[in-house]
Amino acid sequence: MIHDPAEPPAAAAEPPLDTASPDGAAPVADTRPAAGNQDIDAATASLAVEEDDEARLPEVEDEPEAEPAQAGAGPMAVGRSAIARAVRLAPTSPGVYRMLNAERDVLYVGKAKNVKKRLASYARPTGQVLRIARMIALTVEVEVISTTTETEALLLEANLIKQLRPRFNVQLRDDKSFPYILITSDHWAPQILKHRGAQSRPGRYFGPFASAGAVNRTITALQRAFLVRSCTDSFFESRTRPCLLYQIRRCAGPCTGEVDFPGYSELVREATDFLSGRSRAVKELLAAEMEKASGELEFETAALYRDRLAALSAIQSQQGINPRTVEEADVFAIHQDGGYSCVEVFFFRTGQNWGNRAYFPRAEKSFTPAEVLGAFVAQFYDDKPPPKLILLSHEIEEAELLADALCVKAGHKVEITVPKRGEKKELVAHAQTNAREALGRKLADTATQARLLENLATTLGLPKTPQRIEVYDNSHIQGTNAVGAMIVAGPDGFIKNQYRKFNIRSEGLTPGDDYAMMREVLQRRFKRLVTSQAEGDGEAAAKAKPKDDDVPQWPDLVIIDGGRGQLNAAREALSGIGLTDQVTLLGVAKGPDRDAGRETLFLPDRDAIKLEPRDPVLYFIQRLRDEAHRFVIGSHRTLRKKDIREAGLQEIPGIGPTRKRALLLHFGTLKEIERASIADLGKVPGISAESAKRIFEFFHARPD
């Protein structure tokens, strides 16, 4: 398994706690009021450095004196001095505070019921755990934002953590929105479809599902069971005859009156009931209808009901464990090992298991399982509606406050609990087993990846083990829809949230000039990097957040999909922006007949390298190259499909209006024409064997 998200690069090296720090007084605190609830759209909280237990914090009158740090004072003294200045201006009301370093990178975001007392606890000269002491030693400034309530502070804290990604907070990674199933209600013939993002379209939403694959499989089975349409409204309105889905019994054909309004409405109601958890009643109804049709010797109708029942059984067989007493809940379980944490999340809705996903949050090794889990759950519901019940494997701090915040967000009561017995405890135990197994696989993959990177450095003679590898490739068909792409890999595997595609823009580019395309891609990528550092980002640029559009991070190794010619084009591109020999380049040429295992490696000013076909380093390089190829081909096909949709069939030589009409009448949609084989195309009236081949090649041309 290659884990998608990657841990952001480490911040600048920390100064030792007993050495001098940079000069300069720390600015005073910023006590701006919060902008209002409309700006607090997150529903979570992160770890507080300490408890809000007032017995642990100094009284207000005992706040530290804000004496300026003496010249040559150590980092701890400078940090405490900066915090003491902030304490003098900090409010005694709820709020959120941010610790900043000399480069104004946010080190930590926290919230407190009494901000003044919380900040005063950091300024104590003794009693800090190592993690907090390290943070204080790097702090030169503190910013404070006041809020009306502690709940509002909790929500704002989580929002800022997700935006700023401070290194001393627990950070949720791979926070991709979850897919839902939507049955629309804004058309007389409702549509079923997969949905991500804001739930703004009228209809019933069912989810979340753990993956898009789970949603797609469920929708396909639901179409077989309930014959609900999945086409767009515009396609629906343009039909004069049923499409292919009607022919294969995955749609009832409401577009052309194959089913009347009451009949289709009943199908939609049954689908809604099934997704709402009333699956037993729906199956009993279908079984009764099947028996009735069979008794009346309507065997074709009985077979249809039989197939619908089989489709429902297929859905439930994919869901695995389905609870008997839990209607709606999310289950969180954490396991820690080797300084890593894994949180496994299971989703149960309408009494059905809708999947699970493993997360690997970034956290300091000193965090306990309860601390990591509390911060994770808090951030998890930033852009997701919470269920009525949240089951946890560990007790977390401020569970009641978090439940209140989620209640405000969701508009219904939210309960957070650690079950002690019964089926709920079994669900948590099952999730914890999955977390332990997922972390075991993660650790094994990480160790393997580390060894591969070390061996790669040895094989290529690199000065150090690469921590960031960028791989470049481009794709086109005779110069059309030309696109370049960059993929990124590191110790944690592929870093997919840093992949980038580059639509080729150069005017006057010779169609199919791969070298010129590569030059353009590399110049655009590295000009951004040079510009970001020239603007004064310095080390901050190297530590930029992975979701930054420009991805201003220096690679340790750049791999080019191509031989000596592509490598020289890459060197020329970098030389043109003053980066001659500042970036390590590697060209990977395919073997004879494109045989895997016979690749040749090229480094600048060195002889070509040929590795044994079974060499793990060669296999690793192949995997990197193939991932870049997969990504760029996908990007190219997306552009090509967009052009095909806009142009339709008119672009195919020899296909005029008559043949176009015949194809659409036979297949129903452009998508079905694209899927058809040459033999299927040849069955259409007026389409010769030569025309069928031409149509097939138009849709299936292989990009370069």
Curated annotation (Swiss-Prot):
Family: Belongs to the UvrC family.
Region ranges (Disordered): 1-77
Keywords: Cytoplasm, DNA damage, DNA excision, DNA repair, Excision nuclease, SOS response
GO cellular component: cytoplasm; excinuclease repair complex
Subunit text: Interacts with UvrB in an incision complex.
Highest taxon above the source species: Bacteria
Originating gene: uvrC
Job of this protein: The UvrABC repair system catalyzes the recognition and processing of DNA lesions. UvrC both incises the 5' and 3' sides of the lesion. The N-terminal half is responsible for the 3' incision and the C-terminal half is responsible for the 5' incision.
Biased composition (Low complexity): 67-77
InterPro entries listed in its UniProt record: GIY-YIG_endonuc, GIY-YIG_endonuc_sf, GIY-YIG_UvrC_Cho, Hlx-hairpin-Hlx_DNA-bd_motif, RuvA_2-like, UVR_dom, UVR_dom_sf, UvrABC_protein_C
A biological-process GO annotation: nucleotide-excision repair
Pfam families named among the record's database cross-references: GIY-YIG, HHH_5, UVR, UvrC_RNaseH, UvrC_RNaseH_dom
UVR domain mapped to chain residues: 280-315
Cell location: Cytoplasm
Organism, scientific name: Rhodopseudomonas palustris (strain ATCC BAA-98 / CGA009)
UniProt name for this protein: UvrABC system protein C
